Amino acid sequence: LLRQTAYTEDDVAYLPDHGEITLESSALALIALADCAETSGNTGYIPACEALGAGILSLLDTGTGSFTHVLDASDLGRKEAVRSAEWDGMGVTALCRLYGLTQDPLWLWAAELVLDRMIEEDPAQYGDVWTACALREVTKYAQDRTDYFVFALKHAQVNMASVYGAQGTDPAGLEMLLVSCETYGAMLDAGYSADGFASELLQEIIAVRAQRQLDGYLFPEYAMYFAEPQKVLGAFMVREDGLNISASGMCRNIGGYSLYAVYCDKLAAEKPSEYEGA
């Protein structure tokens, strides 16, 4: 990843992707390096993270809070203003992770600038896990911004029905709701009220979705029908996408079920066993 990162003369870094510079690739690279830095404690990753952060800032119009999503890698000219709404959430998440590493207020300021613009728009269009991640990350540091918490709950609530009704095995919905659940818990811990939020419905949908998503898990009984069962055993597939198995889908499933395990442990700790005291 570090070898593929391209630097300008001003120590601004991007991750080129098939002749393009995209907000997506640079944000994901920064998040991955931030994970490495936090997990290993190796501060040697921070300069690369800061350079990628500067690259993300170069895509940001500070007057409007909007990102340019795609540049031409050959001359850094603007190629596409918006390619995917979820990329905004990726950019905000990356900037917040960088703030967590460096405590440089520039990164948090930029993240809030983008979120302020997103809040003014229709939250229903951001029905994705990256928006949920962005709100979870920013509320770790901007707990005085009640509007961010409100936006997080609205984002979850307007997307509950679509996640519940989804019959396929796409993993994004489960992770989105679990991340939103974390933000909801942080909101309560910060002393804010969440009156009107359908928390019990959220818990019900999370449980249903976690069970339904297992239809895409390749148990031995499913894997045996593939040409090379040993290569797919224990993987996740997306049934509605031609039984496709992808690295991104695997990451989403692992991320979602990891959060679900933590969520279930927390629920168990909060609810006394029916046998307690028997």
Task: Explain the meaning of each model-derived region.
Residues 25-63:
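A charged, solvent-exposed segment within the mature domains of Sec-exported extracytoplasmic proteins
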Residues 44, 79, 106, 147, ...:
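A structural signal for alpha-helical segments
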Residues 21, 41, 79, 83, ...:
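Structural signature of alpha-solenoid helical repeat scaffolds
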Residues 1-11, 47-66, 100-124, 142-167, ...:
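Long, well-ordered core segments of solenoidal/helical folds
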Residues 165-278:
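CBM-like carbohydrate-recognition segments
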